[in-house]
């Protein structure tokens, strides 16, 4: 993302934690030092009391890495470099470091991977770890079983091997990737594996913020899995095609379409009288007909009040 957009995301991390009444961060874990994983942590160092910072023991040549290390030093925090097998008590549970087992030239394989256990519930957070790191974890013989697997490297083809999925047997997979990202994440091969194993999927590009709460016995979520196994590049191509078709349809019909008088709504009118768009499938209403994977040709218009009365909810992406 651009520096301006990146700064917005960093502020969102801080604001989310403040909304949860977080004042102290017991453990801040920097999986590795790529900008998309490190950026929000600097803001957190400046806004919260941080007890421990865990990171990977290598030097990244970037201004952001230098800022991160200098900010930690300014707050009298020494970055700790854990070893595989190190376990940390955390609330009613604990987490164990699963990787990296050594430092690689590939920064993604330097990701600190943890397995968090709370009672009968378990989560594994992969960072950007790729297949080499996955094989290292499997070779240790450590328990990789987890209820929730946060997929490595945004679902890229270089991560989430069959061996890892068979070793971890997750009940749910969480995929963090940007909407319409230029990398084409997630990869078709990754999504095919999840589909073939019937693993329910949550995706940030489809669903926004995803929250899982563990009480030690059950895991509750803020929404249902989307189970969208479409590859990122295919989704982008489909969206571009839909927009192109909609533009062509509009251009062809403009000349023959009768003039229609439209009435400008009174600015003081109830916002539930405003027009919204509803896709042919889905449970959300939208501010535009081409949000996400919507087909503009099949989108219909209703008032917001009508949409609400039918059980639709506002899309968090476009409102």
Placement of each model-derived feature along the sequence:
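Active-site HxH/HxHxD metal-binding segment of metal-dependent hydrolases
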Residues: 35-74
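Binuclear metal-ion centers of metallo-dependent hydrolases, dominated by the metallo-beta-lactamase
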Residues: 59-96, 101-108, 179-253, 257
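Active-site environment of divalent metal-dependent phosphoester hydrolases
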Residues: 33-38, 60-63, 86-89, 130-135, ...
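Mature, structured domains enriched in cysteine- and short glycine motifs
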Residues: 233-319
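Single conserved hydrophobic/aromatic residue that forms the stacking wall/gate
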Residues: 1-5, 9
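Proline-aspartate-enriched helix->loop->beta-strand connector
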Residues: 50, 169-175
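Metal-dependent phosphodiesterase/nuclease catalytic metal-binding core
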Residues: 110-169
């Amino acid at each position: 993302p651009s520096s301006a957009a990146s700064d917005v995301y960093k502020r969102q991390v801080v604001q989310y934690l403040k909304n949860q009444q977080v004042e102290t961060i017991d453990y801040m874990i920097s999986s590795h030092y790529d900008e998309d994983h490190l950026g929000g942590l600097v803001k957190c160092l400046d806004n919260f009391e941080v007890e421990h910072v865990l990171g990977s023991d290598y030097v990244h040549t970037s201004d952001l890495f230098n800022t991160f290390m200098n900010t930690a030093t300014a707050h009298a925090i020494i970055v700790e470099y854990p070893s595989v097998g190190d376990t940390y008590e955390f609330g009613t549970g604990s987490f164990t470091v699963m990787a990296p087992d050594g430092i690689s030239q590939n920064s993604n394989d330097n990701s600190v991977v943890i397995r968090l256990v709370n009672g009968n519930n378990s989560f594994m957070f992969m960072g950007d770890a790729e297949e080499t790191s996955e094989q290292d974890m499997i070779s240790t013989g450590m328990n990789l079983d987890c209820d929730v697997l946060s997929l490595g490297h945004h679902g890229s083809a270089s991560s989430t091997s069959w061996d890892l999925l068979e070793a971890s047997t997750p009940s749910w997979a969480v995929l963090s990737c940007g909407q319409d990202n230029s990398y084409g994440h997630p990869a078709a091969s990754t999504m095919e594996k999840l589909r073939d194993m019937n693993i329910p999927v949550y995706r940030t590009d489809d669903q926004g913020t995803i929250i899982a709460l563990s009480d030690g016995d059950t895991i509750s979520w803020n929404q249902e899995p989307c189970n969208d196994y479409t590859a990122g590049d295919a989704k982008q191509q489909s969206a571009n095609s839909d927009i192109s078709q909609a533009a062509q349809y509009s251009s062809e019909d403009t000349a023959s379409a009768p003039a229609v008088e439209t009435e400008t709504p009174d600015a003081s009118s109830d916002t539930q009288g405003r027009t919204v768009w509803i896709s042919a499938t889905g449970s959300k209403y939208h501010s535009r007909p081409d949000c996400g994977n919507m087909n503009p040709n099949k989108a219909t218009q209703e008032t917001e009040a009508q949409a609400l009365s039918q059980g639709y909810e506002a899309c968090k992406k476009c409102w």
